[in-house]
Swiss-Prot record:
Cell wall formation. Adds enolpyruvyl to UDP-N-acetylglucosamine. Phosphoenolpyruvate binds at K22, N23. GO terms for cellular component: cytoplasm. Belongs to the EPSP synthase family. MurA subfamily. Gene3D superfamilies: Enolpyruvate transferase domain (3.65.10.10). The gene is murA. Its EC number is 2.5.1.7. The modification 2-(S-cysteinyl)pyruvic acid O-phosphothioketal is found at C117. One of its GO terms (molecular function) is UDP-N-acetylglucosamine 1-carboxyvinyltransferase activity. This is UDP-N-acetylglucosamine 1-carboxyvinyltransferase. It comes from Prosthecochloris aestuarii (strain DSM 271 / SK 413). The keyword Glycoprotein does not apply. It is found in: Cytoplasm.
Length: 425
């Protein structure tokens, strides 16, 4: 098992390129299942544990996969299975994305109940409701979701989500693209990753209106054709790197980004006293000598993202005052706080609100990751802590950050990956 060893106190400077979005790559890869001929070529697919697991899953289903550099080529014309097994699905919740495409293309799908990050309840009921609205019969047997159509194709219907859901919106879009008739989706997610999925599906021949809005209309088509498509940048990775610069009082530039996807995050960095300079497809953050305490409420896009909440808490440990952090997406997403407090942070949890008292002198110790973004939060804390911090179980980090220690080291961090033996008690 791997850990990251960080000697804190180094100011980050320099320039780094943003990776492709993990949260966009996974539904894009799933959408290739909708093509019954030819090869889809996806550019800017990050090399991550989750993207590799998704490639394994498609290969298990019978797809031909080729990955080189950041280009992924997928041919799904010879699929031989409609079951996504527990052995693969347990590794990440996003495996549920294959449900809609398999059901739309073959009329049947069996998907193991998902795994992934362990924080709070994240039900899949909205995915199942969407499939039922398109005419599927759903049952759960022996730990598997079993979905089927009595005959023919899925049929268009009206899907109204009671709450915004990125995953359920993506699954509904993919299934509806091959459904017979018209599907309308209200309260659809407007995250950039969903807009990218719409763009990919439309490039393949899907008829989708309203991309980027909460109201989508999909006219089903008989088939989709393979295309080449470039993934969007990872706004969460970019935000994490900006936080790394801010917490170390550094100055960094990130290239290959679209700043319009980061409006809420950049606004908060500015409120905290950081200077942001935008230039075409890059931006530069210059940290102030004194960070100002800045409250956040994590909510669906276009508001501050829940996937940046943990990193913001780490940053606010160095702010000159107290900050309030509320997560309206995942109310219980505070597993990182006890570990931050072990480093010397002073953070209270009051119901669904975290109160961060800063500035606090953090000192290095051994901490343990509990999920993907908690891992990033602990790395940020390690960058500013005095002495040596060891972050264990960084396999969580590898699910969503491409070569993160290499990027941080390039910017001046003293960070190394080492292997260690974890003993059970």
């Amino acid at each position: 098992m791997d850990k990251l060893v960080i000697n804190g106190g180094h100011r980050l400077t320099g320039s780094v390129a943003a990776s492709g979005s993990k949260n966009s790559a996974l539904p894009l890869i799933a959408a290739t299942l909708l093509c019954d001929n030819g090869t889809c070529r996806l550019e800017r697919i990050p090399d991550l544990k989750d993207t590799r697991t998704f490639q394994e899953l498609l290969a298990y289903l019978g797809a031909d996969i080729s990955y080189s550099g950041s280009r992924l080529s997928v041919s799904t014309q010879n699929l031989r299975a409609i079951q996504a097994p527990y052995e693969l699905v347990k590794k990440m919740r996003a495996s549920i994305y294959v449900l809609g495409p398999l059901l739309a293309r073959f009329g049947r799908a069996e998907v193991s109940l998902p795994g992934g990050c362990a924080f709070g309840p994240r039900p899949i009921d909205l995915h199942l409701m969407a499939m039922e609205k398109l005419g599927a019969s759903i049952s759960i047997k022996n730990g598997y979701i079993e979905a089927s159509i009595a005959k023919g194709r899925l049929t268009g219907g009206h899907i109204e989500f009671p709450v915004s859901s990125v995953g359920a919106t993506g699954n509904a879009l993919m299934a509806a693209s091959l459904a017979e008739g018209t599907t309308t989706i209200t309260n659809a997610s407007i995250e950039p990753e969903i807009t990218a999925l719409c763009d990919f599906l439309m490039a393949m021949g899907a008829d989708i209106k309203g991309a980027g809005t909460t109201a989508l209309t999909i006219e089903g088509v008989p088939s989709l054709h393979p295309v080449a498509f470039t993934n969007i940048f990872d706004r969460i990775e970019a935000g994490t790197l900006l936080a790394a610069a801010a917490i170390t009082k550094g100055t960094i530039s990130i290239t290959g980004i679209d700043h319009t996807h980061m409006g809420a995050v950049l606004k908060k960095f500015k409120q905290a006293g950081c200077r942001i300079t935008i230039d075409d497809d890059s931006l530069t953050l210059q940290s102030p000598d004194r960070l100002e305490p800045t409250d956040i409420i994590a909510s669906p896009y276009p508001f501050f993202p829940t996937d940046m909440q943990a990193q913001w808490i780490a940053l606010m440990t160095q702010a000159n005052g107290s900050s309030r952090i509320i997560d309206k997406v995942y109310h219980e997403r505070f597993n990182h706080i006890p570990e931050l407090n072990r480093l010397g942070a002073k953070i209270e949890i009051n119901n669904n609100e975290a109160i961060v008292h800063g500035p606090q002198l953090l000192t290095g110790t051994t901490v343990m990751s509990t999920d993907l973004r908690a891992s990033a939060c602990l790395v940020l804390a390690g960058l500013v802590a005095q002495g040596t911090t060891e972050v264990l179980r960084v396999y969580h980090l590898d699910r969503g950050y491409e070569k993160i220690e290499e990027k941080l080291r390039h910017l001046g961090a003293d960070i190394q990956r080492e292997n260690y033996q974890e003993f059970s008690t």
